[in-house]
Amino acid sequence: MQKWVCVPCGYEYDPADGDPENGIEPGTAFEDLPEDWVCPVCGVDKSFFEPVS
């Protein structure tokens, strides 16, 4: 699964890990994250993320 990085702070969202502290189960693709999900480090929305190449 594609990893995504937060451009402002460098946090990397890995679908294999999810974001359990914020209710996101492991195995959740970035595209399947809720629209109101934000970076757990700096709080920006999904539009600030880019795919990791």
Swiss-Prot record:
Details of cofactor binding: Binds 1 Fe(3+) ion per subunit.
Residues annotated for Fe cation binding in this entry: C6, C9, C39, C42
Record keywords: Electron transport, Iron, Metal-binding, Transport
Pfam families: Rubredoxin
Protein's GO biological process: alkane catabolic process
Coiled coil: none
UniProt cross-references to PROSITE patterns, sorted A to Z: RUBREDOXIN, RUBREDOXIN_LIKE
Cofactor(s) needed for function: Fe(3+)
Family statement drawn from the similarity comment of this UniProt entry: Belongs to the rubredoxin family.
NCBIfam families to which the protein is assigned, alphabetical: RubredRD
Role played: Functions as an electron acceptor for pyruvate ferredoxin oxidoreductase (PFOR).
The protein's name: Rubredoxin 3
Organism for this UniProt entry: Chlorobaculum tepidum (strain ATCC 49652 / DSM 12025 / NBRC 103806 / TLS) (Chlorobium tepidum)
